[in-house]
Amino acid sequence: MLCFLRGMAFVPFLLVTWSSAAFIISYVVAVLSGHVNPFLPYISDTGTTPPESGIFGFMINFSAFLGAATMYTRYKIVEKQNETCYFSTPVFNLVSLALGLVGCIGMGIVANFQELAVPVVHDGGALLAFVCGVVYTLLQSIISYKSCPQWNSLTTCHVRMAISAVSCAAVVPMIACASLISITKLEWNPKEKDYIYHVVSAICEWTVAFGFIFYFLTFIQDFQSVTLRISTEINDDF
């Protein structure tokens, strides 16, 4: 286990396990409390009503932090690899990081502004998180191909691009169907006119969310051979 998490591998590993736990625990508590229907609630539905709202908010906030830490570490890894063997313009890597961090900010917004309390802000945060997150995975997949075979195996590149493609394919109907729903609510009746839009949107939302989780899982091997150091200097003038 310790060998598996050598180097900086513990960062994406913690992100994956913590985020998975956040989704699952919030869902279980919300269902057992009778606050949501067990069949395909939105992820945000499982974090709207106390006590699950507190669990969801706390855990997703920390997931956003871990996501930012993982993305920044990945940025530094690619930067160092590119210095050793040039394969991509540094701007491409920087744009990817910027979009990823914006997505993490969106996660923070989702965690702190519940969908029934401030739906406009919540939905805006969700849009940032999902769209920027999907574009981030796509850009990182392209970078992986550019660095192949020096820094990534072709299999890893294919897996990352496959996850990115599925996420891209899911995020479009997720947004489209969600925009067609006329009311924000936690419980749905199959006979309601917007029910099909809710189901399609919820399926796509869960697909994209766990797509992110599986994508970051592919970073673990890359992070195993990496060490980050913080350098401290004291200025004698002060």
UniProtKB/Swiss-Prot annotation:
Subcellular location: Lysosome membrane
Recorded topology in the membrane: Multi-pass membrane protein
GO BP annotations listed: apoptotic process; autophagy; cellular response to oxygen-glucose deprivation; regulation of autophagy
Pfam families the record matches: Frag1
Keywords, comma-separated and alphabetical: Apoptosis, Autophagy, Lysosome, Membrane, Transmembrane, Transmembrane helix
Similarity-based family: Belongs to the DRAM/TMEM150 family.
Function description: Lysosomal modulator of autophagy that plays a central role in p53/TP53-mediated apoptosis. Not involved in p73/TP73-mediated autophagy.
Protein's UniProt name: DNA damage-regulated autophagy modulator protein 1
Lineage: Eukaryota, Metazoa, Chordata, Craniata, Vertebrata
Name of the coding gene: Dram1
